[in-house]
Amino acid sequence: MSDIAIEFDDVVAGYGDFMILNNLSLQAKRGRITLLLGPNGAGKSTVLKTLFGMLKVRSGHIRLHGQDITGANAKDLLVKHGIAFVPQGRNLFGQLTVWENLELGGITLGMKTTHARIPEVLARFPRVKERLNSAASMLSGGEQKQLEVGRALLLRPKVLLIDEPSIGLSPMVVADVFKLLRQLADQGTTVLMVEQNVKSALKMADEAIALESGRLVMHRQADELLADPNIERLFLGGAHQAATPPSTGAASAAGIL
């Protein structure tokens, strides 16, 4: 069995007529944490959204564990292929309770299975467990992010896509989230993530892929890259000029890239 979980082969994808991924080819290994790096607009979040079926593949192929999933929709990717996606920002139903948000996260499983799995998820997030009857909007930023991750874990995903998990969180909560991701990978889950705190993320990641203008420019072991004295110049602002989408239409929002 191949150790390659995710494979992009000359993928072109984007928003409307504006292509962000330009014949992108990359691979991510099974049971590893692969970190996507690059300046704003390089295509990091676009990779996740394309893989999760939220953006149309204009050309090229995407394979998961050797199976061509090009063109599959998000529901099929979630239910049939075991891909879960935790997007950037807060994506909860604020007026609903923690318990109700978890129930909705498991809607494709059926309530019996969902209720059986919720205690398993809550065991990973004791602070969230204490707030089961609270509205999601009343949770702290860290608790909300933990709830989002927990909701994804209800599905016992084979592949977890996570976009900027540290935004708005305290260093202590970020450390907890990174520790959980490391545990999941060690247990066999493939994690593909985008993260602004490059150095912290590299410390717990296995591999790193750098993008520029929707193309792969580097794929290295995370520990090797962490030791590179040029890391800050390369990935914390300065070395590359990224593509900038048009100012009109949905692609104008910086958060989508």
What spans do the regions from the language model cover?
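Helix-to-loop junction immediately C-terminal to a conserved catalytic motif
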Residues: 52
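ABC-type ATPase nucleotide-binding domains, specifically the catalytic core motifs of the NBD
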Residues: 16, 34, 56, 96-116, ...
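ABC ATPase C-loop
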Residues: 152-153
